[in-house]
From Swiss-Prot:
Single annotated GO MF: GTPase activity
Name by which UniProt lists this protein: Protein sey1
Residue intervals of the GB1/RHD3-type G domain: 31-246
Entries under Pfam families matching the protein: RHD3_GTPase (PF05879), Sey1_3HB (PF20428)
Entries under InterPro entries matching the protein: G_GB1_RHD3_dom, P-loop_NTPase, RHD3/Sey1, Sey1/RHD3-like_3HB
Entry's family note: Belongs to the TRAFAC class dynamin-like GTPase superfamily. GB1/RHD3 GTPase family. RHD3 subfamily.
Amino acid sequence: MQQSAQLITENKEFNEDFPRFLKDVGLDNVGFDYHVVAVLGSQSTGKSTLLNKLFGTQFSTMDTVRRQQTTKGIWVSRGKDSSILIMDVEGTDGRERGDDQDFERKSALFSIATSEVIIVNMWENQIGLYQGSNMTLLKTVFEVNLQLFHENIERSRLQFVIRDFLGSTSLDNLSETLMTDLNRTWASISKPEGLENSVITDFFDVDFSALPHKVLCAEAFDEETDKLREQFLDEKNPKYLFKPCYHKRIPADGFPLYTQGIWQLIQNNRDLDLPTQQQLLAQYRCDEFIAEAMVSFDEQCEELLTFLKTHQSIENLLQRLEAIQTSTFSIFDENARRYQSEVYTKKRQELDRMMKTRLAVPIQRYLAAIHKELVAGFPERIATLVKDACFKDVARVTVSEMVSVMHSEAAALQKEGFVCDAEQTVETLRVELLQLVRSMREERLAQISAKLMVQFEQEFADAIDVSFHHLTKDIWDNIMHKFDELREKVLDEMLRSLNEYIDDEMDEDAELLRTKHMFKLKRSTWLVLRRTLENETAEPILQQRLRTHFEDSFRYDSRGIPKMWKKSDILENDFNKSLQDTLQLIDVLAIVRLKDGSVPTVDVPLAEEGEDTASNLEADTFFTFLNRKKKANIHVSVKRAADLVFLDCKRSIISTATRVPGYFWALLAVLGWNEFVSVLKNPVLLTLLLIVVSFLFILVQTGLAGPVKAFAERSVRNAVNSMGEKLAEKLDDYRSTSPASETTSGRVISAENSSVDEKVSTTP
């Protein structure tokens, strides 16, 4: 079966075998159940490739090596698994035809007159170009189409397919540009009577699609092509292209005769003839003069780039640009004004557009250099001015000044037509400066926050240290009171800084920024609380603090004076009381709980987004520092340390009671009476006695008698122990040097050793 056929030859002849082709592909007897699609566009833009991809046809495609014309005339084929007749039209602007645009216009007019949907295939970089986007061709086609068929014209769809779409410019913006060009083209054509006020949408529905690069973005190209295919094939698709109003209402078996009649009408119409020889000559010569003028223009552009590196003022730049344009126009006008005025005027406008387009590059570099210079100097200027003023005020004024500088430059260039959108240039600078302001602000606020947290952590750690050195049952009330006090101080300071750095006029989300920074600081204070208390309640540290607390409460009275016990029952009572108080503190320190039994309330979420909700930052475990195992370990450790202290004190009482029996004092009074009387009679000894008595009296009155007594007892005990050890050494030496004596006097030595050992053992 024949896959495709040539409907119109390259010599503008209609194929008489077209009816046989329709029969071969099975479209001759489908009645109205068929559709016609044609594709227009420049040569070598991939029209045939697109049709093959969309409809499964097998049109010949371009030789990518030699880049020769493949489609000559108009070829037709039936879409795979569909009743769609596809027309592949020879590309426009091909080198094979050169300036012969007659076939281009006639084939385009034929396509519009016979097809329901006309695919206009173009590259993205052709948009905005008058010739490249086929606006000249469409203008002629629209005009003649109205003249020939306005009495019985049918609606059609123009489906623009933008190829090699990059996405840097949105499809909406490209569509808007094309639609503007179409409306301008339609407005410029001469219309038949009664259609003077018509618009293009009265006769055409216009839509736009975009396809990525077929080679560089193959997967994306296939995906978007599949979507576009569904618009042709799926009647349930919201973007289905073949609306009933587009159909020409010609049965399939009569379509060959209908198309042949359309082609003959177009062939015989003089309105589609080639331009006159005078116009051709004018166009040809004016193009030569444009090329000549552009040589001089390009040389001056190179000089302009060097000129711009010196950062000249905008006035000097405008003068230079005007001189370049004047010089270029003078070269063109010198010869071109002698030719047809209409062609001369159009070509002069074309030259002006070309110059504006090429000058856009150095001008953009000039504006980019100003932009870069302003942005580079912005942080330094802010840092200089902020020393004497508020950050937000300095930032607002500096942004306004720099934006004003850019606006004056861009507006002056826009006024002369060198810049299309000065506001966009200014807005780009404004956005970047505001981003710099935000970046500098965040950096400074982070420094302030870090500094405040260091200060807070240090002061809170000092307060915690003091509280844990003097453990009480209301320790948590004291700590939380100090925490709230220091925290309020830090938050107030941070809020003041936020008000200095965040500008309600420049920042739409000013309140949100304040809330975010305050939230982070509040959370940090709670984490410092947790971290500091974890350090203080670590098992070894807490054990030592509780031992110290026990000894302080057990060994010293309320005035801080060391206690001396004479009776065991008093010692035991003091021990039990101090031990119970100390052990009760373990439960107190295990969890932060205030006097009223409540746990402090955390005013911010402690777990960051994404953290496990069962982490130790949750409220139910945040204030718990000792579990059962830790409490048991600390309890045992403190109890053992307390027992050792108790035994030491108990031993001291027993030792004192054992060393000084009651009869000793009576014996001392009887035997020492004479000595006592002699002391009273001797002035020197009496004076010495009075001094000693006075010293003892002072010790008793100041409460130092107990410590002095304990010191003396320890000294005597140590001296006795030392003497016993020395005596034992002497006895050992004596045994080693006198064995006979040891034998004969064994019992005596044994008795002596026994008495010494007994004497040493009674000294605790």
